[in-house]
A protein has these predicted regions:
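Nucleotide-activated sugar donor-binding and catalytic core shared by glycosyltransferases
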Residues: 1-11, 15-32, 38-46, 149-162, ...
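Flexible loop/turn segments at secondary-structure boundaries
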Residues: 12, 108, 199, 218-219, ...
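Short, hydrophobic alpha-helix immediately C-terminal to the catalytic nucleophile
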Residues: 18, 109-113, 258, 315-316
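Nucleotide-sugar-dependent glycosyltransferase catalytic domains
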Residues: 32-237, 242-255, 262-266
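Short glycine-enriched loops at secondary-structure junctions
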Residues: 53, 125-126, 274-275, 331-333
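Nucleotide-sugar donor-binding loop of glycosyltransferases
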Residues: 103, 123, 272, 310-311, ...
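Catalytic donor nucleotide-activated moiety binding site of glycosyltransferases and closely related
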Residues: 255-289
């Protein structure tokens, strides 16, 4: 079977698709992965680019309403237009038997219909699959149970997607015959790449929604950095990572984390990512190591604690490692995951970004450390998940 995989977003959106691509290829399928231009090219995968620079669209030059509106017009909207067109062009060129796509690939339904092939949508948090049991993960009510009104919150992401309907229609020029199909078929299935240990399946999800657990490589091919390995072996440590987030004062965040960790006698591995964390000179010392990134499967298993932004991928990686957490959400589905981790006993109550301080972290770290036993239990259960295997089983059954 020829599988076209299309994803958009940050590392947490790309790496799971790469894991799916590798596993599907290992089972004899022909797979092509379309991904953002600034994503690391995955080894051993046939890939193409989507004319999308995610870091650029996540980094507006200012935080005033005017600056954000200008950024939306000048960067976000044009980037989405290019991605919509590139997704159509690359999918048509590959001639797939099945299209598997991220919800942000807004032209995927159109191109699948035009080619007469089924499609499957992938969710890393419940945003497109509505439920009366919980609110949409990415909206302003993501951490509040609205009861009977929960289902209405899913209208927000649908309304945002409709803003680009005109761009999707114009991308039909890339289709065979240059015309948009006069219908839109529903997805054949939804792959909810979420662990039931962090989000038990709501009883009103339809049968076509398959909750597979998270997608990750079962064995890392990367070798640990000797400098990082030596640091980790020297005593208890915290892993601090805000991934792709870069909003606000990175040095102030680094200072708060290092100060709070030292209060608890912990050393700190700072992963600077896209610039969301930095270490002020006055905080430097032998108990702190700063690197841009490191494989989570190397640095998390021995950690006493993780401080992170609550992205879906990071939340699953930390919980799967059996490590308690302090979550500082920035945006999107991060407040949802911070609340879920706390609800299931593996993290302290989330600290809103605007309230982050050394004092707040001292208290939260103490709380999180007391949850080690529960984190170990949940991690053991999550490591039984075989997300990519189950996902490919579903694709093969369609």
């Amino acid at each position: 079977m020829r599988l076209m995989l299309l994803t958009a977003g940050t590392r947490g959106d790309v790496e799971p698709f790469a894991a799916l691509a590798r596993h599907a290829a290992s089972r004899g399928h022909e797979v092509r992965l379309a991904l953002p231009d600034d994503a690391v090219a995955p080894a051993g995968v046939d890939w193409v680019r989507l004319d999308l620079d995610v870091q650029r669209i996540l980094s507006p030059a200012g935080r005033t309403p005017w600056a954000l509106a200008h950024h939306l017009r000048a960067e976000v909207r044009p980037a989405m237009r290019r991605t919509i067109v590139a997704a159509v062009r690359e999918t048509v060129a590959f001639e797939p038997d099945l299209v598997v796509h991220h919800p942000l690939i807004l032209s995927a339904p159109m191109v699948a219909d035009a080619l007469g092939v089924p499609r499957v949508v992938v969710e890393f948090a419940p945003v497109a699959t509505a439920s009366a049991r919980l609110p949409a993960a990415g909206g302003p009510t993501a951490t509040r149970d609205l009861g009977a009104r929960n289902r209405s919150t899913y209208a927000v992401p649908r309304a945002i997607a409709r803003l680009f309907d005109g761009d999707v229609a114009r991308a039909a020029a890339e289709l065979p015959g240059g015309r948009r199909p006069g219908f839109r078929s529903p997805s054949r299935a939804t792959l909810m790449a979420v662990s039931p240990q962090l989000l038990p399946r709501p009883d009103d999800w339809p049968e076509r929604v398959h909750q597979t657990g998270a997608w990750y490589e079962e064995a890392s091919a990367a070798s640990p950095d000797p400098v990082v390995a030596d640091f980790l072996a020297a005593g208890p440590y915290v892993v601090a990572s805000f991934g792709s987030m870069a909003k606000g004062d990175a040095s102030a965040r680094g200072r708060a984390i290092v100060t709070a960790a030292r209060t608890h006698g912990l050393r700190v591995l700072v992963l600077t990512g896209w610039g969301g964390l930095a270490l002020p000179a006055e905080c430097d010392g032998p108990d702190v190591l700063v690197v841009r990134s490191a494989p989570f499967d190397h640095v998390l298993p021995g950690a006493a604690l993780a401080v992170h932004h609550g992205g879906a991928g990071t939340s699953h990686a930390v919980a799967r490692a059996g490590v308690p957490a302090v979550v500082v959400p920035f945006m999107a589905d991060q407040p949802f995951w911070g609340a879920q981790l706390h609800r299931h006993g593996v993290a302290a109550a989330p600290i809103p970004l605007r309230r982050l301080s050394a004092d707040a972290l001292v208290q939260a770290i103490g709380d999180a450390l007391s949850r080690r036993e529960r984190a170990t239990e949940v991690g053991g259960l999550m490591r039984r998940d075989r997300g990519v295997r189950q996902a490919v089983d579903v694709l093969e059954s369609l």
